[in-house]
């Protein structure tokens, strides 16, 4: 079966990611070793995690330490969350396809390839047959007590019992011929495509855990936790709750292609775009799930070491955790302000207890990936008798305005030639923060009204660009370079420049994501939502959603853009044309040349450029016959 959990956020292109992958990848940051860290007795593994209060602003609270258990929802809770999603979505929701829903529920239910997605899973047909009834139940159109979830939960129980017998027989048969260390560190779960029969996986788990216990007696408690997670002895009510949580998780992205819901134990997965833009502290770089825990492949922060099998972290056993919970556990542990205990399996040393001090005033643990102000790549490229500054902006972060300000000021201060103009290279930029886009635009359009944004109730909000100090502003020529992968907040930047006739857009038609997402606590305080709550238009009212930006100067790139665009996504928000909110006084000053100058002629002298496409764009901007030489597109809409 193909696993395709869709995870997209504001500014991320809507692509299916095989989230069931056994590899976890991220940045690593240093951790100080505890002075007295030494081998010692292992703490008792636990299946319970902390229960911090849920704040109103979900991103500003620490991630909770996950429990290792899957989320459960009651029938009423599932319905309340679904109702909240349907009511707060920026547009009238369409019908969810029952077949796709059933497949997605089975996928979210099974983090191992054992319970419902394996090719021999006897539960697969149950999910196909029961999908329509389950969908009706969570939408409030079905039975009063969500009987479909109860039926599916009951159907899973005998299958788990059958697999447990296979597991027990393999474990009793004894250890594998391979050494126990190899068995403890060997990856065991498949990635995007699950092709291995569940019976085979159950037997493999049994033999590998038998090998580990035979060699490392102290690991027995962790093996017991692993066994309980792989083959849980839950009641039908327990299973029904897990099915309902999986149903909500499957439902939201099928209704909103940029949306998601995650339980509090896995909420970091809802913020993956934010985490990528602002990397948190980390304890390792890459890892893989094994039968008994998580093996660190690379980038371990001391006192952890590459090759360690992490059996527990912050008192929680790692075996049998979903990838989402492992990721959140590592972030939560690294964010701890005091110390965190871990137990690792370390080759001939056996079980080793270590104490981590992730954030005790040590500046060396600062994010390796975090950019400081002015870290945006800025290239000065010959443009006639002057230089054109080309700024590569790969994503739109909250602090893009500061980054752009510092980067341009630094380059301008050290430039030995006049600056002909600035090109914002937004190719491949999937977007990010609306605040970041608005702040960046303040450098070129200070104080102007920008994007009208409409909510479901018809109310319209309009933000203004900030008014940075005069020394930070750029009144000279500017342009945006875009391609088919330019989306969302990046389209905002390019589109605003064009709407105000401030500068041309060069390249090809953009992705067309004219909607924005917000993070919300669900009404049940059971998890976090990422939901499309706003549709936006350009300052002149032109739509972006499903349409994209048509460049002022077309430039065919050698590598074609993706075939899929926002308009191709199922249940993508509709196109919305907004009011014209432009400041007419600013338009008049731009048109008469008092606000900013036009791109000068380059006389054929451009480059050299590291990227040939950039030189092509610059030649278009300064060509005598180009509209960009005196950029005045048709007025109005």
Label every PLM stretch briefly:
Residues 18, 22-259, 579-637:
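Terminal targeting/pro-maturation regions of precursor/exported proteins
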Residues 298-309, 332-335, 417, 496:
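A short glycine-leucine-enriched loop at secondary-structure breakpoints
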